[in-house]
């Protein structure tokens, strides 16, 4: 595997259309106020001492800004940014090639770090703690370990499933940071800023309507904004108003709470079962990957108290049942 294959550009890791909307500095970053406030202190301290900032673990549901924050940290530190993803690092040589090509204080970003091969993960231990690599040279009885020094660097790991990280790896991150779902007010600001960047007029009520149906997630908000911009371009409307946003989102299959058809199928399946249901059964019924269910569907449904995870399986709440009974869905 060539270096260009394992060192992915940001365009490959994150939706290309979001890049122009991405903030470049912490002062431009909206939301995650506690995380941003602490990062400013850690970055300033590291920059003043001319040392790499301690290794950072960003975790939380998808689409909350983990990749964006990693980019910003490198820019604030005025160092190079290198990025890859856990599934791409299949061999020890892949990781060694990246680490030995880093410069002092560079930032290495590993997305989906929970998907690292355990053998690859073990190589990171000495790299993170001692800034060195233990490489086995030779085979059989003649094999020996060669220690190679690497420049001091910062590893930023991102994961949507922190529970899948081994304790030894998790404990080596000096700065663990949990990203939370966004409030409606924060998402409204994100949408208005993005609309300005892409030269699209939007009313305050229009931005708020999109934010209310974006599941507390900036990535979803920006995706919906782009799709509504398509509608407004074709219909020759001047501004995204509350009414226009509402109608466009309904055409996209997004209801008042931001639930789509797959969410409703998920809820109806559990409701009709009338018993706790295991994730594998749900996955089979919906023809949906279990990882996708656990990472993209369930977190928001848990947040709005529509489902509960129990030792026996998933259980629908009375709040969700009432909501389903109030709605009429064209499945």
Swiss-Prot record:
Gene: ruvB
Molecular function as annotated in GO: ATP binding; ATP hydrolysis activity; four-way junction DNA binding; four-way junction helicase activity
Function of the molecule: The RuvA-RuvB-RuvC complex processes Holliday junction (HJ) DNA during genetic recombination and DNA repair, while the RuvA-RuvB complex plays an important role in the rescue of blocked DNA replication forks via replication fork reversal (RFR). RuvA specifically binds to HJ cruciform DNA, conferring on it an open structure. The RuvB hexamer acts as an ATP-dependent pump, pulling dsDNA into and through the RuvAB complex. RuvB forms 2 homohexamers on either side of HJ DNA bound by 1 or 2 RuvA tetramers; 4 subunits per hexamer contact DNA at a time.
Any one GO CC term of the record: Holliday junction resolvase complex
Primary subcellular site in the record, as a coarse category: cytoplasm
EC number annotated for this UniProt entry: 3.6.4.-
SUPFAM superfamilies membership: P-loop containing nucleoside triphosphate hydrolases, Winged helix' DNA-binding domain
Ranges where the record places region Head domain (RuvB-H): 256-331
NCBIfam families, per the entry: PRK00080.1 (NF000868), ruvB (TIGR00635)
Region feature (Large ATPase domain (RuvB-L)): 4-182
GO terms under biological process: DNA recombination; DNA repair
Pfam families registered for this protein in UniProt: AAA_lid_4 (PF17864), RuvB_C (PF05491), RuvB_N (PF05496)
Family, similarity comment: Belongs to the RuvB family.
UniProt xrefs under InterPro entries: AAA+_ATPase (IPR003593), AAA_lid_4 (IPR041445), DNA_helicase_Holl-junc_RuvB (IPR004605), P-loop_NTPase (IPR027417), RuvB-like_N (IPR008824), RuvB_C (IPR008823), WH-like_DNA-bd_sf (IPR036388), WH_DNA-bd_sf (IPR036390)
Protein name: Holliday junction branch migration complex subunit RuvB
Written domain comment of the UniProt record: Has 3 domains, the large (RuvB-L) and small ATPase (RuvB-S) domains and the C-terminal head (RuvB-H) domain. The head domain binds DNA, while the ATPase domains jointly bind ATP, ADP or are empty depending on the state of the subunit in the translocation cycle. During a single DNA translocation step the structure of each domain remains the same, but their relative positions change.
Gene3D superfamilies hit by this protein: 1.10.8.60, P-loop containing nucleotide triphosphate hydrolases (3.40.50.300), Winged helix-like DNA-binding domain superfamily/Winged helix DNA-binding domain (1.10.10.10)
SMART domains attached to this UniProt entry: AAA (SM00382)
Reactions catalysed, as given in the entry: ATP + H2O = ADP + phosphate + H(+)
Binding site residues for ATP: 22, 63, 66-68, 129-131, 172, 182, 219
Binding, Mg(2+): 67
């Amino acid at each position: 595997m060539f270096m260009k294959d394992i060192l992915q550009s940001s365009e490959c890791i994150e939706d290309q259309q979001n890049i122009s909307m991405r903030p470049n500095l912490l002062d431009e970053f909206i939301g995650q106020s506690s995380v941003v406030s602490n990062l400013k202190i850690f970055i300033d301290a590291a920059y003043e001492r001319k040392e790499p900032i301690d290794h950072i673990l960003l975790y939380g549901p998808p689409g909350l800004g983990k990749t964006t924050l990693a980019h910003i940290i490198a820019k604030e530190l005025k160092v190079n940014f290198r990025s890859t993803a856990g599934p791409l690092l299949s061999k020890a040589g892949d990781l060694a090639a990246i680490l030995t090509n880093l410069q002092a204080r560079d930032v290495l970003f590993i997305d989906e770090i929970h998907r690292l091969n355990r053998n690859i993960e073990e190589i990171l231990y000495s790299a993170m703690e001692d800034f060195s690599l233990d490489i086995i040279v030779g085979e059989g009885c003649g094999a020996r370990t060669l220690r190679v020094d690497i420049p001091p660097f910062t590893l930023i790991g991102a994961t949507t499933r922190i529970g899948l990280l081994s304790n030894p790896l998790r404990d080596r991150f000096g700065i663990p940071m949990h990203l939370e779902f966004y409030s409606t007010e924060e998402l409204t600001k994100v949408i208005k800023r993005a609309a300005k960047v892409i030269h699209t007029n939007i009313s305050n009520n229009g931005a708020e309507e999109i934010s209310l149906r974006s599941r507390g997630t900036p990535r979803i908000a920006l995706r919906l904004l782009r799709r509504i911009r398509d509608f407004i371009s074709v219909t020759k409307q001047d501004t995204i108003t509350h009414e226009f946003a509402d109608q466009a989102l309904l055409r996209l299959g997004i209801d008042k709470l931001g639930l789509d058809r797959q969410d409703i199928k998920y809820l109806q399946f559990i409701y009709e079962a009338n018993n706790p249901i295991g994730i594998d059964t749900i996955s089979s019924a919906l023809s949906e990957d279990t990882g996708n269910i656990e990472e993209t569907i369930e977190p928001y449904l848990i947040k709005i108290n529509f489902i509960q995870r129990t030792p026996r399986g998933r259980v629908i709440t009375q709040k969700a049942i009432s909501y389903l009974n109030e709605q009429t869905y064209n499945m």
